């Protein structure tokens, strides 16, 4: 399974409807958006997976940005704006 198809299936939970879009941002990035992911009652948040040089961020607008990142930290945050 490719990274793109794995992220697409994660961004489309079975019991919700969603709109998704995929577009390239630059040579080292890809942007995906979906309105179907929620973080508690607020929706949104951020989650980083940079361990292998890859960073995935889910922001409060539920966009997933994938970029090259050499950081070794992993974090998750969720909150209301």
From Swiss-Prot:
Example of a GO biological process term: sorocarp development
Top-level lineage group: Eukaryota
Any Pfam family matching the protein: Coiled
Family matches, as InterPro entries: HssA/B-like_chaperone, HssA/B-related
Region (Disordered): 1-31
Annotated Low complexity bias: 9-31
UniProt similarity note: Belongs to the hssA/B family.
UniProt-recorded name of the protein: HssA/B-like protein 1
């Amino acid at each position: 399974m490719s990274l793109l198809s794995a992220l697409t299936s994660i961004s489309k939970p079975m019991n919700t409807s969603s709109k998704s879009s995929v577009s390239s941002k630059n040579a080292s990035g890809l942007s995906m958006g979906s309105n179907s992911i929620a973080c508690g009652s607020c929706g949104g948040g951020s989650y980083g997976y940079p361990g292998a040089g890859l960073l995935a961020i889910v922001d409060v607008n539920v966009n997933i940005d994938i970029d090259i990142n050499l950081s070794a930290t992993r974090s998750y945050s969720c909150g209301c704006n």
